[in-house]
Amino acid sequence: MGFTTSSVTDAIAALDERSKEIFRRIVEGYLENGEPLGSRNLSRLLPMSLSPASVRNVMSDLEELGLIYSPHISAGRLPTQIGLRFFVDAFMQVGDLSAEDRATIDRQVRGSNRDQPMESVMTEASRMLSGISRGAGLVITSKNDPVLKHVEFIRLEPTKALAVLVGDHDQVENRIIELPAGITSSQLTEAANFLNAHMTGQTLPDLRRQLLTLKESVRHELDTLSHELVERGIAVWSGGEDEGKPTQLIVRGHANLLTEVGGAEDLDRLRLLFDDLEKKDSLIEILNLAESGPGVRIFIGSENKLFSLSGSSLIVAPYRDDDDRIIGAVGVIGPTRLNYARIVPMVDYTAQLFSRMSRPGL
């Protein structure tokens, strides 16, 4: 039977307390052990007195709404994807992390930051998230475009120059750039002066967009060769087609996902998930998902088109630099029976920790 989203939402809102309690017990049983729950066991668990026959009637109503289903004839019930989403939105209580949990995350992640490259910090964070989640922990870092402070072109030979860019936190990037044929030293200076006049407080993508709106001004202020040099400089600094795309993904805990494999079909889904994680477009999509709303985002099964074929859930949160720009994401990928209530605050806190670590002096 097909339902529209609004009709299901209206019907769910009209559920009585008895139906909600039975539904909640079915989902909690699934999240705890992955097993279907039958009417006889449910009748023993409920705080109110209900016969197995009465429980079966309620389960039938819940099944008609699309919230639960029977995996086998005469078996108990499991939540559907719609049911899991309803549970997460309506029943799940996400509390604050305990002081002990926060201290553990600080020790494992921030502690690994002592004189360690960022890759080591990312690895430790993804390992920590994997350890608490029964899933795979992931950390993505994207290219962080610095706010520009100063630029200079230094000729190395007739056809090449060193393009030096200084960011607002005094980070320096040096790139070798091919020079337009016939360009003079004065034209190198002219191009650098133009960039310095227009770049203050902007990132390279900002400057590239601004140049599109300043075509007439550029044409009047710069000759053809200087203009070409400006465009080449921006292109080489911003990485051309890779601008703004993630540069690194760390995933730990693949073995956790193998524990959920129940047969060849599950193994095929897992292969699809691993294949998806290898694709650069997938990393971009994860970052886009993290940016699509405030705080932690939860995607269950086919709600997330990226991992819909593998039937996986994704819990993800962005982290930011000191200018509040999103520069990466942390999260967990795993089976739909993740411990959402525990994982969500941990992903949230880890993202906040990465944000603080990404800021100078913290």
UniProtKB/Swiss-Prot annotation:
A single GO BP: negative regulation of DNA-templated transcription
Key words, A-Z: Repressor, Stress response, Transcription, Transcription regulation
GO MF annotation list: DNA binding
UniProt cross-references to SUPFAM superfamilies, sorted A to Z: GAF domain-like (SSF55781), Winged helix' DNA-binding domain (SSF46785)
InterPro entries associated with the record: GAF-like_dom_sf (IPR029016), HrcA (IPR002571), HrcA_C (IPR021153), WH-like_DNA-bd_sf (IPR036388), WH_DNA-bd_sf (IPR036390), WHTH_transcript_rep_HrcA_IDD (IPR023120)
Function per UniProt: Negative regulator of class I heat shock genes (grpE-dnaK-dnaJ and groELS operons). Prevents heat-shock induction of these operons.
PANTHER family in the record: HEAT-INDUCIBLE TRANSCRIPTION REPRESSOR HRCA
Family: Belongs to the HrcA family.
Protein name as catalogued: Heat-inducible transcription repressor HrcA
Organism from which the protein derives: Rhizobium rhizogenes (strain K84 / ATCC BAA-868) (Agrobacterium radiobacter)
Native organism taxonomy: Bacteria, Pseudomonadati, Pseudomonadota, Alphaproteobacteria, Hyphomicrobiales
Gene name linked to the record: hrcA
